[in-house]
């Protein structure tokens, strides 16, 4: 007779699965035996007699009594009887026996109601488990039918009792081995420590924990996490839990802190970053904690980081992410010194220090560049106020279009410098909403400055080439200089996740970044930066260079052009006016990148000051021209070279 290959293959698969499942059941630490108890209509009782040891447990049933007796506990010794809720119209009850040897916990459930025969009594080292099935006695009318272990039916026949023989194992080690195989094994450890029926220290081979009780008088607590004996006490993390952690609606609640010196439960795939060895987990019993008013503080001890590396506080929320996913959301990194870093976090989960090599994302001489730019912006602020006053005073009584265009540029530069100074301050003291608003205003100031420089180029082009017979209305310039940037920023605000806190890390101290309110480092922000900022800057710089070339070509044959100071002032004044100094931003590479960066910060932060100097030079030349007795054209030609599009 021929065998069917498909049937043969299926049989082998079933046999293999049964073998694997059988092995898993035999080796599993916890025990669960269920069945249907057939009894009479008289009142029922649950009797139990439990003693310490590791021999056997017998589960039996008759007309009125369900009995649990044996020697399997580590510390629990209990013997008593419990009267069960009975229904005279029902002659059967479903029951389950749960045995957790690690906690020395034994619970019997009858018709959905739990009866705890042995309460949790610490975490047991050596315990009695691996309960293997022994003999069963048959019954005739009353007893247990459909007996099962962890869902697997033992027999459907009516039995009077079930006997299971136990064996000693190291429960803590086996529990840790099981946790290491689970995707979120740390949750298993945290749950076991949470169920630890006492306050204080809990020791496992894979983790150490402590249970802290918060009552109505809880005002915060500082403590050092428990650690293995072989670890130096001076290197153990310390934790501060604030009073805001306690729930007002609950009189008492437990905080569990778990400490892992071995990071195998938390490692992810290949990455350019690496976790430090210390992992700290924090949780509150039956609660999800987020957005704390006062943060929890975890201080880690470590060796000094390499010059090109930084350590930042990260957390893994195992309730949201099934796989290891370390994020810095909700955590601030505070550098205490070279060997201590403190994490301030507004939520509870697992925390660690992630060390990264960040050569490309750091800036050399950041403190010096920041100081230079801040001083330059402060000087430009004052210069813009003075220049705006001069322009208004000079043109009072006659609305000159050139003066109005200049005023627009002066106001834009003033806004840019003002918000640049404020952004570093507000990033450290203001909330997220204020920082987003400040970042958008700083971006508006930058775009408005670039647009007004483009308007200066366009206005000069109209005057030099005389494209139109009559000048364009001034509102067109103001619409493009102030309205167009407002439209762009409004669109970015509506998109969301564009503006916020930005951290710029100095190369000599990557753990102490400069905070500013600007465009964030997200993908959407980077896309907007390259399209809008870089795109507009490229247009302004290229058009400014072209216009500068055309103007210089037109005036280079004038008599006074040969005087060096006049030529220099002409080119420099127009360069600032047309925004061509921003071209230095495209030259930040190669061996002279640091020099270029310093020049970029110095020149562009002082742009308001240079424009004021340009205007002052024009006024002096105008006065000399007026006071000239012979009426020569020398002064006017100088003025024309500095300001080809301004008519006095």
UniProtKB/Swiss-Prot annotation:
Q: Name one GO cellular component term.
A: plasma membrane
- Output the GO biological process annotations, alphabetical, semicolon-separated: adenylate cyclase-activating G protein-coupled receptor signaling pathway; cell surface receptor signaling pathway; myelination of posterior lateral line nerve axons; oligodendrocyte development; peripheral nervous system myelin maintenance; regulation of oligodendrocyte progenitor proliferation; Rho-activating G protein-coupled receptor signaling pathway; swimming behavior
Mind telling me which residues the site (Cleavage) is annotated on? 348-349
Name of the encoding gene: adgrg1
Q: What is this protein called?
A: Adhesion G-protein coupled receptor G1
**Short name of one Pfam family:** 7tm_2
Name the SMART domains on file.
Answer: GPS
Q: What happens when the gene is disrupted?
A: Fishes are more active. Hypomyelination characterized by a reduction of mature oligodendrocyte number and myelinated axons.
Query: Where is the protein found, in the record's own terms?
Result: Cell membrane
Single Gene Ontology MF annotation: G protein-coupled receptor activity
Species assigned in the record: Danio rerio (Zebrafish)
Which InterPro entries does this UniProt record tie to the protein? GAIN_B, GAIN_dom_sf, GPCR_2-like_7TM, GPCR_2_secretin-like, GPS
């Amino acid at each position: 007779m021929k065998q069917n290959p498909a049937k043969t293959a299926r049989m082998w698969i079933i046999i293999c699965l049964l073998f694997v499942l059988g092995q898993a059941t035999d080796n599993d630490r916890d025990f669960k035996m269920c069945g249907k108890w057939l009894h009479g209509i008289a009142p029922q009782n649950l009797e139990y007699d439990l003693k310490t040891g590791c021999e056997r447990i017998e589960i039996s049933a008759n007309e009125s009594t369900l009995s649990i007796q044996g020697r399997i506990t580590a510390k629990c010794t209990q013997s008593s009887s419990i009267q069960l809720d009975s229904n005279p119209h029902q002659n059967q009850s479903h029951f389950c026996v749960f045995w957790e040897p690690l906690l020395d916990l034994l619970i019997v459930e009858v018709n959905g109601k739990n009866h705890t025969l042995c309460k949790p009594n610490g975490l047991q080292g050596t315990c009695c488990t691996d309960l293997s099935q022994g003999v069963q006695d048959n019954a005739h009318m009353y007893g247990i039918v459909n007996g099962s272990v962890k869902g697997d039916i033992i027999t459907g026949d009516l039995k009077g009792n079930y006997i299971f023989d136990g064996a000693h194992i190291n429960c803590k080690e086996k529990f840790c081995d099981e946790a290491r195989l689970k995707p979120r094994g740390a949750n298993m450890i945290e749950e076991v420590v949470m169920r630890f029926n006492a306050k204080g220290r809990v020791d496992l081979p894979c983790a150490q924990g402590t249970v802290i009780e918060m009552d109505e008088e809880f005002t915060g607590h500082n403590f050092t996490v428990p650690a293995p004996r072989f670890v130096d006490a001076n290197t153990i993390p310390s934790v501060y839990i604030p009073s805001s952690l306690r729930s007002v609606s609950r009189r008492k609640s437990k905080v569990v802190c778990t400490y892992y010196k071995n990071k195998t439960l938390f490692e992810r795939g290949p990455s350019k970053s690496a976790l430090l060895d210390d992992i700290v987990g924090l949780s509150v019993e039956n609660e999800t904690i987020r957005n704390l008013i006062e943060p929890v503080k975890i201080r880690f001890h470590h060796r000094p980081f390499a010059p090109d590396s930084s350590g930042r506080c990260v957390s893994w929320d195992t309730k949201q992410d099934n796989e290891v996913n370390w994020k810095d959301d909700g955590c601030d990194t505070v550098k205490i010194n070279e060997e201590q870093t403190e994490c301030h976090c507004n939520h509870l989960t697992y925390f660690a220090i992630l060390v990264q090599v960040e050569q490309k994302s750091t800036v050399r001489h950041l403190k010096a560049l920041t100081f230079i730019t801040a001083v330059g912006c402060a000087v430009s602020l004052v210069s813009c106020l003075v220049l705006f006053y001069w322009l208004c005073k000079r043109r009072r009584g006659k609305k000159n279009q050139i003066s109005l265009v200049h005023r627009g540029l002066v106001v834009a530069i003033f806004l840019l410098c003002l918000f640049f100074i404020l952004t570093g301050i507000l990033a450290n003291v203001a909330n997220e909403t204020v920082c987003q608003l400040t970042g958008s205003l700083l971006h508006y100031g930058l775009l408005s400055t670039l647009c007004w420089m483009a308007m200066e180029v366009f206005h000069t082009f109209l005057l030099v080439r005389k494209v139109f017979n009559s000048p364009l209305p001034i509102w067109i310039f103001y619409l493009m200089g102030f309205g167009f940037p407002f439209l762009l920023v409004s669109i970015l605000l509506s998109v969301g996740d564009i503006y916020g806190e930005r951290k710029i890390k100095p190369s000599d101290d990557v753990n102490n970044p400069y905070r500013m309110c600007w465009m964030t480092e997200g993908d959407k922000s980077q896309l907007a930066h390259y399209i809008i900022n870089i795109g507009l800057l490229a247009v302004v710089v290229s058009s400014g260079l072209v216009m500068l070339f055309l103007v210089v070509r037109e005036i280079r044959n004038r008599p006074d052009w040969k005087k060096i100071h006049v030529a220099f002032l002409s080119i420099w004044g127009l360069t600032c006016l047309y925004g061509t100094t921003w071209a230095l931003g495209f030259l930040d590479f190669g061996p002279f990148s640091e020099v270029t960066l310093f020049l970029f910060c110095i020149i562009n932060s002082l742009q308001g000051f240079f424009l004021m100097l340009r205007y002052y030079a024009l006024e002096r030349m105008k006065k000399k021209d007026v006071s000239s007795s012979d009426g020569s054209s020398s002064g006017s030609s100088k003025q024309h070279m500095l300001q080809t599009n301004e008519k006095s």
